[in-house]
Amino acid sequence: LQPVPVWGLKAVSIGMLVDEKQAMIWRGPMVMGAINQFLTDVDWGPLDVLVVDMPPGTGDAQLSLMQKVPLAGAVIVSTPQDIALIDARRGVTMFEKMKVPVLGLIENMSYFCCPNCGHNTELFGHGGARKEAEALHVPFLGEVPLLAAIRASGDDGTPIVASAPESEAAQAFTHGSYTPLTLP
């Protein structure tokens, strides 16, 4: 399988292989098979870093990946609600038990910025991931706001930092509270 070059990255996804109208009803063995196929059958070529976007939770997908590949680290992404932070906490605990360094926690949908008046509204709460990171003694890596421009650029297939580098949305990624990662 050949990865698709996208903005200087090599990408592959189950979504690229299955019709968008087809339901993905997979049990653990099918998920594990897909992960194994992506790791062994995709012609990645030389890589500095392999980023794997995983579904939330602590199930078969995460365990399969940890068994197949020596991971340099994991970044946990969570929204600020208490219920989401429970999953984030479980994820941190799972990676630590499996001896995978947790590189940090990111808060997604940290706040909504009204495109008309610029007022920030904390729809899902705010700061929960930062507090959780502190409690778990892992680095807090930053916040991603809920902005229409980020969604629109994603739908267009162009990163917001490329399509509108000076925008508030782009600056959330480039000038925000982000902490650069150093891999172990």
Give the role of each language-model region.
Residues T182-P184:
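Hydrophobic heptad-repeat coiled-coil signature
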Residues S13-I14, I76-T79, L105-I106:
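Conserved beta-strand segments of the P-loop GTPase G domain that flank and frequently precede/overlap
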Residues V12, I35, M54, Q67, ...:
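Glycine-rich phosphate-binding loops of nucleotide-dependent enzymes
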Residues G57-Q62, A84-D87:
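Short glycine/serine/threonine-rich phosphate/pyrophosphate-binding segments
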Residues Q62-D82:
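Inter-motif core of Ras-like GTPase G domains
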Residues N36-D43, G59, M66-P70, E96, ...:
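Signal for well-folded cores of large energy- and translation-related assemblies
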Residues V92-P180:
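C-terminal lobe/tail of nucleotide-utilizing enzymes
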Residues L1-V49, T58, L71-G73:
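Nucleotide-state-sensitive switch-loop elements of NTP-binding domains
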